[in-house]
């Protein structure tokens, strides 16, 4: 997997959202974000080899392999807010809608929350 990634986020999202993520959680989100293509109309199920995924998020200790489900579970619990400056409304949303570990193939499937589409697609 190429380690030169480009991540695109809307300026609105950057200015009007607040979230608190650990370094590993940030790396997961940025790695996953880099798989979103500019022409994508919808989020996909992003499948990554677990060994490559651990390397990409900077986990070198193989004992962390067993901690990866804990890291993604904690990430799925992280709710953040996106504020609408015009209406005063705000959205509370989690980054991920699903994570599936496929032990037989050594892969992990990750899915962004569909509520993030306006902030990450068609930019």
Regions found by a protein language model. Give the residues of each.
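Charged, alpha-helix-forming regions
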Residues: 1-123
